[in-house]
């Protein structure tokens, strides 16, 4: 076997093994995140510490599937004092009717609807937030995307870390729920078995370089310190950048122990492709190093490649005589075999964890 071929072979082995190590880490790191016991304990500590009044900002655009059901979870919070501010940019937005239903269903809940067409920059969601922020009455703010569903103790849990003056932003990891047929299922797998595990791995290595639109909790003082929502009006990844700007001012980003749910509704391959490629472009723009590591974090192709090579070149493979004659290292085949077994275990664990939330 030539030196070049041997080097290429060992490079493939190294990549397959690295993907397996990553998959095992992703499957088994932070096992209690989002667990019932951890959430219950976090809620208990939040109650002991005392709840603060909260203004929840929910920018809306269109009547998404399950919009009423998702927004209703914010109306059912076990929190003594909070305000819900919903915002749309058009008087014809069908989300208005959903907000009116919420107001009728929870007449004693502090629910306000802001209809304001002013545009402040290229990011229309941030323009909506700028228009809504003036109606927020409390000094603790929570921003959450429209397709998010939460548990009853959510507000207390995500705002509790803000009592520490060193904390700037609290964010939440999320679990995907498919709404519809095959393609929404694929989109949910992308979140549950690739994106969420990558965040867990990054967090376990000490990284706090994230901020998710599923939840961004901060104080009004922190928001003003970074320039308000106006500082994000022309930014693509506004959620990520809000947390990063706070970190640039020496304030920590905290990942809350509670998981929220997000809906995946794209009905066709084309719409799902647009969503995922837009997401990947966003990652590339804000985290080039993380984007460069994507080939390893997509572990299934490496697992298939490793298994195929073992099947072909292993002791009972069709190309076993050729590999022996060429001097293919037995250690490389053994490493590939071990990597394949470990990768299969990791993929099964990732799927179970993504499906059940353990």
Segments (PLM) and residue ranges:
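N-terminal membrane-anchoring/stem segments of glycan-assembly enzymes
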Residues: 1-48, 185-189, 197-201
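Membrane-embedded multi-pass helical conduit in multi-pass membrane proteins
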Residues: 28-30, 36, 297-358
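Cell-envelope/extracellular polymer assembly enzymes that use nucleotide-activated donors
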Residues: 52-55, 83, 241
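Short, acidic, metal-binding catalytic loop of nucleotide-sugar glycosyltransferases
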Residues: 72-81
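A conserved acidic beta->alpha catalytic loop
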Residues: 80, 88-102, 118-120, 148
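Long helical/loop segments within the catalytic core of UDP-sugar-dependent glycosyltransferases
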Residues: 101-138, 157-226, 230, 273-274, ...
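Acidic donor-binding/catalytic loop of UDP-sugar-dependent glycosyltransferases
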Residues: 144-161
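Catalytic donor-sugar/metal-binding loop of nucleotide-sugar-dependent glycosyltransferases
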Residues: 234, 240-262
């Amino acid at each position: 076997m030539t030196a070049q071929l041997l080097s290429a072979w060992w490079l493939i082995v190294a990549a397959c093994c690295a993907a397996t190590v990553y998959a095992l880490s992703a499957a088994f790191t932070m096992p209690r995140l989002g667990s019932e016991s951890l959430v219950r304990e976090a809620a208990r500590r939040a109650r002991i510490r005392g709840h603060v009044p909260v203004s929840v900002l929910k920018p809306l655009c269109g009547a998404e599937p399950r919009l009423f059901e998702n927004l209703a979870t914010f109306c059912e919070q076990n929190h003594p004092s909070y305000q819900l501010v919903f915002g749309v940019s058009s008087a014809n937005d069908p989300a208005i009717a959903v907000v009116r239903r919420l107001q009728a269903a929870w007449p004693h809940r502090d629910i306000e609807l802001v209809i304001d067409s002013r545009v402040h920059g290229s990011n229309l969601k941030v323009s909506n937030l700028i228009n809504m922020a003036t109606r927020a009455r409390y000094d603790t703010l929570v921003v959450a995307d429209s397709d998010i569903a939460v548990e009853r103790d959510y507000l207390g849990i995500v705002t509790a870390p803000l009592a520490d003056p060193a904390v700037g932003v609290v964010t939440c990891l999320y679990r995907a729920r498919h709404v519809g047929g095959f393609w929404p299922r694929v989109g949910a797998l992308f979140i549950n078995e690739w994106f969420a595990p990558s965040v867990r791995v990054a967090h376990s290595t000490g990284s706090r370089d994230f901020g998710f639109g599923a939840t961004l909790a901060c104080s009004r003082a922190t928001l003003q310190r970074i320039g308000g929502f106006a500082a994000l009006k022309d930014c693509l990844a506004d959620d990520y950048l809000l947390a990063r700007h706070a970190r640039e001012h020496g304030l920590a980003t905290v990942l809350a122990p509670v998981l929220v749910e997000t809906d995946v509704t794209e009905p066709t391959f084309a719409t799902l492709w647009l969503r995922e490629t837009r997401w990947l472009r966003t990652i590339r723009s804000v985290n080039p190093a993380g984007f460069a590591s994507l080939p390893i974090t997509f572990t299934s192709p490496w697992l298939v490649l490793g298994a195929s090579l073992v099947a072909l070149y292993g002791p009972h493979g069709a190309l076993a005589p050729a590999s022996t004659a060429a001097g293919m290292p037995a250690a490389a085949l053994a490493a590939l075999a071990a990597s394949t077994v470990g990768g299969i275990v990791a993929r099964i664990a990732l799927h179970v964890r993504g499906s059940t939330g353990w």
